Amino acid sequence: MYRSEIVGQEKLKSQLRKMISKGQSPHCQLFIDSKGYGGLPLALFSALELIYGFEFLNNEEQKGVSSHKLLYHPDLHFIYPVINKSSGGSKATSEDYSENWFVFLNNHPYGGSQDWINQLEAGNKQGIIGVEEVSRIHNKIHLKAHSGGKKVMVIFGVEKLSES
């Protein structure tokens, strides 16, 4: 997300930008919030700043390019709770739901993990981030960055991590 798309949080946005511009960004950043407070938009803002840089993002915003188009970068990975479609067979992964995920980001940037699960029309099923997904995280992190810069992984709904 562009900085201007995030409601409030001016001090935090400035601190994030300053940290990134000085190259002082930690290898792991944790955004904890209550539903609707902007943790996900701040994480997306931070991710885009790390990958593209301030000047590029500023130019794209001036040109009217949607920030959501910038989320489709090969070095930006998303992990989120998923619903297994059927019993047996292979387990569902985040990649199976990527189209739904980008629709969710576009329509509900301040949504919580339950909003995400509701969008999947899961009925009474619970979304989880399973062992297979954690293994995929490990594999993705060890890949070389596509553009030679930074790689970013946004893990949404981490409270849904499961041992199965």
Language model features by range: what are they?
Residues 2-160:
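Clamp-loader machinery-focused feature within the broader ASCE/P-loop NTPase space
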